[in-house]
Amino acid sequence: MPDTIAAIATASAAAAVGIVRLSGAETRCVLAALFTPVDGRSAAELPPRRMTYGTVRDAEGRTLDHALAVVFSAGHSYTGEESAELHCHGSPVVLQEVLRAAFAAGARQARAGEFTERAFLNGKMDLTEAEAVIDLIDAETAEAARNAAAQVDGALRRPLEQVYDALLSLTSRFYAVVDYPDEDIEDLTLAETERTLTESEQTLAALLGTFARGRVLKSGAATAIVGAPNAGKSSLLNALVGYDRAIVTDLPGTTRDTVEEKAVVGGVLLRLIDTAGIRETDDAVERLGVERSRRAVESADLVIVVADGSHTPLTVEPDILALAARAPHWILAISKDDRNPAVKTAVWRLPDGAPVPEHLVSFNSVMPGGLDALIDTIGDCFPAGVPAGGTLLTNARQAEAVDRALNAVRAAHEALTAGLTPDVVLTEAEGALDALGELTGRTAREDMVTRIFERFCVGK
């Protein structure tokens, strides 16, 4: 029988309310040793799901706090076990004292993620839903929170279960036909098998196709800000993050290394990378910075090419444009339009042979509203929303497992089309089942499950 665990479930900072959680078979006994309801009842007799006011005391009878307690019955709690919460005043000192009293009463310190791990082990959620819990906690945008909340509610589990159940039914019937050829067993028709594999392939391909957007949603779009020295790149970074993150001077070449910072811009989480100005240089240190700039562009989801608009003609190096054009999205942003308002309506001539930018916009980093057009353009590059009734894959583990399942289903489909023997189709279909089982936790290895829950905070 699992032991009873305890942890502080709220942030370690002063607040109006702080929560200590308990879970395990001896939860009511531990709670009764700590908490006395105001009406004199034993805490072991509290009705489930109802807040009760009372006093929290340590083993010596000293009052630690006046708090609210609530208990949850096994099978009807987050973990699936007997559980309880003490809602105390949010002093970190008070919460630590209450936690120590819980330990003295027989509970032990919960490991990171152990409450959610118990929920998984007790069948309250699968691995995709458990991972969505930490995604919800870590969400940095409203859209990321909505996607995670939908997955906690089963938005990813449901389509995976449908594919798993369809393939399991298919393989079990295949086994019956292969193992008992003389028995009176209804044969699988080619059309039925074809339909199951086709529908499974379509569902998995659609899910895998969401990973590029999901990765950006969760981790942020790698956004390289590039251009010639002194074009206004660092000023743009500072304006987007809201404080002076990068040094800005009138001297070209001030930024000699990449400077990174996260910011939510137009509802999109960006991992902004201010780069050294790209130019030919004899300075060894600056040359290293330029090389890092090129690498940042090559791995970026979005490239913002900043061109100095304070004077004409516009000067943009063709190799910078060519480099930016390889990115999934890129914007040619004309800076300093407060100094030269004509740039907002000017017709700019790019160097001969230069790629046409996906978006062209002017901006300035000093005037109110000077970034509005650029912010709107960034939002256009990463439209919000998820597929109707669906969700986005957001982590590499899930995407890799879906990819393996998809490849196995395709291989089974190809074997069927080629007229190969049923055992070949079976082998590939079972490979898909293995990948899906690992994804949802049906057949996941213990060490992999442990790594997943180690990412959680203590108390969740």
Predicted regions and their residues:
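Switch I (G2) and immediately adjacent beta-strands of P-loop GTPase domains
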Residues: 52-65, 69-73, 253-281, 299-302
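Generic enzyme active-site microenvironment
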Residues: 272, 306, 333
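Conserved beta-strand segments of alpha/beta enzyme cores
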Residues: 108, 269-271, 359
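A glycine-rich (often HGG/GG-containing) alpha/beta subdomain
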Residues: 1-146, 150, 154, 324-326, ...
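Conserved G/P- and acidic residue-centered "switch" motifs that form tight phosphate/ATP-binding loops
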Residues: 123, 230, 274
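Glycine-rich, N-terminal phosphate-binding loop of Rossmann-like dinucleotide-binding domains
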Residues: 22-23, 88-90, 240, 275, ...
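C-terminal-of-GTPase-core extension/linker across diverse P-loop GTPases
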Residues: 2-12, 54, 142-264, 281-283, ...
